[in-house]
Every structure is written in C-alpha cells, then in structure tokens.
C-alpha cells in the first residue's frame, strides 16, 4: 500500500523484578499516552471538560497560505497542557458587539502533551463570522475556549490500517490523529492519507506531513491531490480529485481490518461520505465510500 503510486492516476510501534517493572511501566505509557496523557499531568490540564470558558492570549500569528493562518495561543503557565485526548477538539467563542455568542469547534494541530501553548490552523472564509473575527486579531488579543470535545475514542491496534480522506482545513483533525498514531511505537496501525486541495500552495501542514512520511515510511503515507499544479514543477502528487478508482486500488477494501476517517468542506463530504446530521449523529453513509461497499460502521465523519 505504501509503495510509490503510479503516475497513471494523475488523470482521473530484587534487580530483575525492578527491570521488568520499569519495562512494563514504559510499555504501558507508550501504549496509552495518546489517549491518557492527562493521567500523568492531571493538575496541569487547562481544559477539564466542564462548561468553563477560558480566555487565552494570542502569542504569535503566522501565514500558512494565502488565506490560512497559524495562531499560537499561550496557556496559563509554562507547564500547562491542553488536557485534550486523541481525536478531540476545542470550542472557540467571541461575543459580537450586539452581545451574541459566536461559537465554533477547532482541532489543535499541536502535540497533545505540548506544554505552555497550542496552535490552531484556521482558513478565512468570506462571510465567516469566527474566521473574520480571528483574522482581525493581533498578538496579545484573547479568545475564549472550552473543551475538550470528544470526537472518536482511538484504541491502538484496533485496525491493521486506516485511511484518512481530507480536503482543505479538514486536514486538522486528520493530522492530529495521524501524527499521534505513527509516533506511538506500540501502535502498529498503518496510516494512509489522501489529501485534496486546489493547488500545491494550498496544501496545509505540508512540512509536518512530509516529515512524518520521511520519518515513518512503513507506518505513514500521504498522497496529495490538486486541481492545478500551476507552476510548481516539483509537485509530486496527483493532478486530479480523489477518484473512486484511486481509492479502490490504493485503499484496503471493506472486508479488511480497516477504518476510514473523512473531513472537509460540505461538497467534499457529500461526495465521499455524506455530512453528519449533528455532532452526535453521523447520518447515513452515501457517496463514493458507500458505492465502494464500505459500511456506515467503517467510516467516521469529523
């Protein structure tokens, strides 16, 4: 599955007893750190799953692409951790001049055990209330957050492999899932990411994704899809959408030990899986994945 993909598709991980105890404890930590890192730093958790909003200042704003920025938020202390677990997110809120609350979910792209700060990658949408507000902020301005919001309870080695299908900022929860899986030496799950964008310049988190692929070639693979490579002669990906034929050839089938995770804008979701009905209702599986024979229980929509 992780071999180089054909260009033909460019179209369509006493003393003896002490040693054993240490080894066992180490294995337990690595096997569980993705879901339960908060167990080891309970007092340092900022977000505890209650209804309390916490105002956090922006420490840095960086350009990620022509319409996307990376916001770094400072946690209360240098030893503070978010308190999130794998496949979870945060609510962000601001209050309009008329007193209305605008609330949106965001998935941090930082390591879950990162101390002192966390990062969000946010795309500006024309007419989007939250994104317009965020893009009008500057360092030291604050945003209110609460959480975590649980999305999916990941269990290491539950599947032999998983496939992540994403487009645009849909990469955020997929990247959080991918990099914590492949960096856990006790989780042997193979991760295959299919990521679509308009142009190579629109690919978000590309540096991080390429670094994962280089460091963990046996556990992680990413294929980029673009509508137009423009003048990027070094682009090494597919100049097409993520086709049904490509998925059928390069993704484990419905009868294998696999699971698929999908995240992207509404048209993308409708094409591959259908949208969720609500945060707690995945809705029916439609689109390309349904046509390929995958069941509703094999696909999760972020």
Swiss-Prot record:
Any single GO CC term annotated in Swiss-Prot or TrEMBL for this entry: mitochondrion
Gene Ontology terms for molecular function: cytochrome-b5 reductase activity, acting on NAD(P)H; NADH dehydrogenase activity
CDD domains, per the entry: cyt_b5_reduct_like
Name of the top EC class for this enzyme: oxidoreductase
Site feature: Cleavage: 41-42
Induction summary: By osmotic stress.
PTM comment text: There are two isoforms of NADH-cytochrome b5 reductase, a 34 kDa form (p34) and a 32 kDa form (p32). The p34 form becomes firmly anchored to the outer mitochondrial membrane after an incomplete translocation arrest. The p32 form is formed after translocation of the p34 precursor to the inner mitochondrial membrane, where it is processed by mitochondrial inner membrane peptidase (IMP) complex and released to the intermembrane space.
Record's keyword annotation contains Iron: no
Claim: Glycoprotein is one of the keywords in the record: no
EC number: 1.6.2.2
Role, per record: The outer membrane form may mediate the reduction of outer membrane cytochrome b5. The soluble inter-membrane space form may transfer electrons from external NADH to cytochrome c, thereby mediating an antimycin-insensitive, energy-coupled oxidation of external NADH by yeast mitochondria. Involved in the reduction of D-erythroascorbyl free radicals. May play a minor role in complementing the function of CBR1 as a DPH3 reductase in the first step of diphthamide biosynthesis and tRNA Wobble base mcm5s 2U (5-methoxycarbonylmethyl-2-thiouridine) formation.
Additional remark text: Present with 1920 molecules/cell in log phase SD medium.
Similarity section: Belongs to the flavoprotein pyridine nucleotide cytochrome reductase family.
Name of the protein in question: NADH-cytochrome b5 reductase 2
Organism annotation: Saccharomyces cerevisiae (strain ATCC 204508 / S288c)
Protein's gene: MCR1
């Amino acid at each position: 599955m992780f071999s180089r993909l054909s260009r033909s598709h460019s179209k369509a991980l006493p003393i003896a007893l002490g040693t054993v105890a240490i080894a066992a404890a180490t294995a337990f930590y690595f096997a569980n750190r993705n879901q339960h890192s908060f167990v080891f730093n309970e007092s340092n958790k900022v977000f505890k799953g209650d209804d309390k909003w916490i105002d956090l200042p922006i420490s840095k704003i960086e350009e990620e692409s022509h319409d996307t920025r990376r916001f770094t938020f400072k946690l209360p202390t240098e030893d503070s951790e978010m308190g999130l677990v794998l496949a979870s997110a945060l609510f962000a809120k601001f209050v309009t001049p008329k007193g209305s609350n605008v609330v949106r979910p965001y998935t941090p792209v930082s390591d879950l055990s990162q101390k002192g700060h966390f990062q969000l990658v946010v795309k500006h949408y024309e007419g989007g209330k939250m994104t317009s507000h965020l893009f009008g902020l500057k360092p030291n301005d604050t945003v209110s957050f609460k959480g975590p919001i649980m999305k999916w309870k990941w269990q290491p080695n539950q599947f032999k492999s998983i496939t992540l299908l994403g487009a645009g900022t849909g990469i955020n929860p997929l990247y959080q899932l991918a990099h914590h899986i492949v960096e856990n030496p006790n989780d042997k799950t193979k991760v295959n990411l299919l990521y679509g964008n308009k142009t190579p310049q629109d690919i978000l988190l590309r540096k991080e994704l390429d670094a994962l692929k280089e460091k963990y070639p046996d556990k992680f693979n990413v294929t980029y899809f673009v509508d137009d490579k423009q003048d990027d002669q070094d682009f090494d990906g597919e100049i097409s959408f993520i086709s049904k034929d490509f998925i059928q050839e390069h993704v484990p089938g419905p009868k294998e030990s696999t699971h698929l995770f999908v995240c992207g804008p509404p048209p993308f979701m409708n094409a591959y899986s259908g949208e969720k009905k609500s945060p707690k209702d995945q809705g029916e599986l439609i689109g390309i994945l349904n046509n390929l024979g995958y069941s509703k229980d094999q696909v999760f929509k972020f």
